[in-house]
Each structure stands twice: as C-alpha cells, then as structure tokens.
Amino acid sequence: MRLRKKWWARPEMEASPLCIVNPKDYKGKWREEFKNDNEIYLELGCGRGDFVTNIANKHPEKNYVAIDLKDEVIAIALRKITESEVQNVRIAPLQIAFINEVFDKDEIARIYINFCNPWPKDRHKKRRLTHTKFLTKYKEFLKPNSQIWFKTDDDGLFVESLDYFKECGFQIKFMTYDLHKSGFDKNIVTEYESKFLKLGINIKFLIAELK
C-alpha cells in the first residue's frame, strides 16, 4: 500500500492520547497505560484500522495495541479509532523486527496477524511475520497458553507457516483452508479480506497456541 506523504500525520499522532509514538518506553508499563488489568491483545500490521476498531468495539473487556510502520497508515487508522470513540485501543508506529523491545514477559495474551506480506522469494522468507525468526521474538512476551490468530489469502505462506509454528513449539488448535465455510463464528472481516472474498479467493486461517 503506497500512500502519499501526509504532513498532518505526525502532528495528529503526537497530539492523540491513543497513539504511542515511542512504544519502546512502555515496555512493562502497558497495564498502567490502560489503567486496568484486562488482557492485552496485539495486532501486527493494522493497516487502516478496520479490524482493531471493530474488535475493540465488540470486546470492551480487552485491551488492544495495534502496530504499523508508516505514519501515513497509522494516522488514517488513528482517525478511525478516534471517531469510533473506543478507549481500549492504543496504536503505535514500529518496525516489527523490534517488537520484543516493546513488550515485557507475559505482557501479551494474543496476537493477530492478518494478511501480512507473503514474501514468496526464498531470500525474503525470513521477513514473514510468521517465520521462526519472528515467532521466537513473540515468545519473549506472550503469556503461557497464549494464541496467535493468523489469516492469509496466500496458500504458500499458509502451508509453510504451519511448519514455522510447529517448529517453535506452538500447537495448532484450529485450521481451515476456507474460513468462510468453516463454521468459525468469531471472525472479524478485514478490508483486505472483503476484497479477496469478492474475487472468490479462499481465506486461510489458523489458531496456534503457545505451550
């Protein structure tokens, strides 16, 4: 997704109490930020914020942290979150390679990874958010029995991710190659998901649990 530079993005981010512009400063302090002891769920690559806004509205008893890289993307998502008036979301700019510098041990109870870049070339596969390189980082801050919910349209990424999860000690609790015909009733449809469905592309989905 290529977006033009938006001059207003960083000032809006810095002015909003919902945006954490220096997330590394909050390691071990996220419960203080939310001012409660509710479980914290993490979305990696939140895009325009549709998913996190909808799920936070549906589950006010949980806290959500949404991460993306570019200010232009964060700012659009921030406006959506702000307009929805949800208070249980914080959004932050971050290169996900540094995600283990943002959360402390047992600080996160669930991770959502929705339609991440599949990086199909062999030399790029270590950039996948489901690669063992990243899963090892997530394990540093996930609570025992935490889950990763992973959705993709890409067959190759999905199949290889199954191996990544198993290699890193996760147990596959649920898996389907066609989410919308699986009977799974806890799905929140994302913007990309809607587009893929219109094209007749099956959505692959799994829940991996950390043991």
Swiss-Prot record:
Catalytic activities: guanosine(46) in tRNA + S-adenosyl-L-methionine = N(7)-methylguanosine(46) in tRNA + S-adenosyl-L-homocysteine
Amino acids binding S-adenosyl-L-methionine: 43, 68, 117
Disulfide-bond pairs as recorded: none
Keyword Methyltransferase part of the UniProt annotation: yes
A Pfam family matched in the record: Methyltransf_4
Record organism: Clostridium acetobutylicum (strain ATCC 824 / DSM 792 / JCM 1419 / IAM 19013 / LMG 5710 / NBRC 13948 / NRRL B-527 / VKM B-1787 / 2291 / W)
Recorded family membership: Belongs to the class I-like SAM-binding methyltransferase superfamily. TrmB family.
Main EC class the enzyme belongs to: transferase
Enzyme Commission number, as recorded: 2.1.1.33
Protein name: tRNA (guanine-N(7)-)-methyltransferase
Residues that, per the record, bind substrate: 121, 153, 190-193
A GO term from the CC aspect: tRNA methyltransferase complex
Gene Ontology molecular function terms on file: tRNA (guanine(46)-N7)-methyltransferase activity
Pathway: tRNA modification; N(7)-methylguanine-tRNA biosynthesis
Keyword set, alphabetical order: Methyltransferase, S-adenosyl-L-methionine, Transferase, tRNA processing
UniProt function note: Catalyzes the formation of N(7)-methylguanine at position 46 (m7G46) in tRNA.
